[in-house]
Amino acid sequence: MKRLLFLLLLLSTVTGAMAKHRKVKVSTPYGTMIILLYDQTPLHRKNFVKLVKQHFYDSLLFHRVINKFMIQGGDPESKHAQPGAMLGNGENGYTVPAEFQLDLYHRKGVLAAARDDNPARASSGCQFYIVQGKVWTDAELDKLEQTRLGGRKIPVDQREIYKTIGGTPQLDQSYTVFGQVIKGLDVIDKIAAVKTDGNDRPLQDVPMKMKLIRKWGVF
């Protein structure tokens, strides 16, 4: 009996830990990305996990692609969209409260929530983007602090990341960052390099498929 109780307790502990540290496999025609969802943004993590479990994102498109900036997807209207149709206005009926964290910033590879222009900066319930960005110089970051960040200083450690790995610091503390690509950064570059139309939609569709990753494999 004691052994059984111990095993049940161990299983409960492991399950609880896994519920926090979630990874998602994103498959595309250009390769596969593995995304780690952050514990510091539980509302966004929970919502994203729910949608992945529901297969919400399967067959949706990366409908907005801007080289040296980001790749965006999650519009439910993109699933059966006609070629050339303008996308980006589809939603799933709710928003997620903003979860800004000073140590979660727009370095290359992060997963962040898209949103419309609302005073609370609440996130879309389904649309997201993955940052490609660019490498910045000190002079560019200095200018950005004055012109776009209202004088807010970029922390030294983050500044070094923007100068070496790159990203989109102009978006910091305006859009919720809630995950990070930990494998497959090259896939971002491949998708970002595709040819697009005047609305930044790829001329050739870039569909996605997502699955949760458990310790013992894909779920």
Describe the function of each predicted region.
Residues 17-219:
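Cyclophilin-like peptidyl-prolyl cis-trans isomerases
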